[in-house]
């Protein structure tokens, strides 16, 4: 019996190490940028930010990610109080537009959320889990607006994604950053393997 337990422990350790190595490999591959990168940024709310970050960290051209809380009623908040302060869980993305375009970023975002769900994504319910696109420059806002308008034309239901200028952003606690890299078996409401599936017709304006 002890031998069996020992073998199972070794298998579990091996699997964990394998997943950790794979996570590092994914990060190295996904961070690829062009020889002459042009960086832009956007903030995306898509439910629990662990999965949203884990997904976009697999996309080549995504240079930096950081999870936090955005567009609330106050300039300060934390994980324990976002329900009261009205913030959404969001992912900050810094990307090289010469490697991945904004329409492609938006198409990736749209495929991993339920755009018709109000204040609910996966098993998570509440205003902090709403969907939203927040921008810091008008050009990004216009592209996002056109993208959502095209999606709405093809939809039978009302799209619940809010589109707003970024009002405020509070960086989340350290244990939330790179959560799925630190916890390979952690909760995730998103199919991360979708990151490797070509966008094809999902892209608008590219």
Regions found by a protein language model. Name each.
Residues 2-206:
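Flexible coil/turn and secondary-structure edge motifs
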């Amino acid at each position: 019996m002890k031998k069996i337990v020992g073998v199972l422990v070794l298998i579990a350790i091996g699997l964990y190490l394998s997943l950790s190595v794979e996570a590092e490999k994914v990060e190295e591959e996904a961070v690829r940028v062009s020889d002459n990168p042009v960086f832009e940024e956007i903030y995306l709310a898509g439910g629990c930010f662990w999965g949203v970050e884990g997904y976009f960290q697999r996309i080549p051209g995504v240079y930096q990610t950081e999870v936090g809380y955005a567009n609330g009623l106050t300039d300060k908040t934390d994980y324990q109080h976002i329900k009261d302060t009205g913030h959404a869980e969001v992912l900050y993305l810094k990307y090289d537009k010469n490697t991945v375009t904004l329409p492609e970023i938006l198409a990736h975002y749209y495929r991993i959320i339920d755009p018709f769900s109000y204040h609910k994504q996966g098993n998570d319910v509440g205003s902090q889990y709403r969907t939203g696109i927040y921008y810091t420059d008008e050009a990004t806002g216009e592209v996002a607006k056109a993208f959502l308008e095209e999606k709405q034309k093809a939809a039978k239901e009302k799209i619940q994604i809010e589109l707003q200028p970024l009002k405020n952003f509070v960086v989340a606690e350290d244990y939330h950053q790179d959560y799925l890299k630190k916890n390979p078996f952690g909760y995730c409401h998103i199919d991360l393997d979708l990151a490797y599936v070509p966008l094809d017709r999902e892209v608008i304006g590219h």
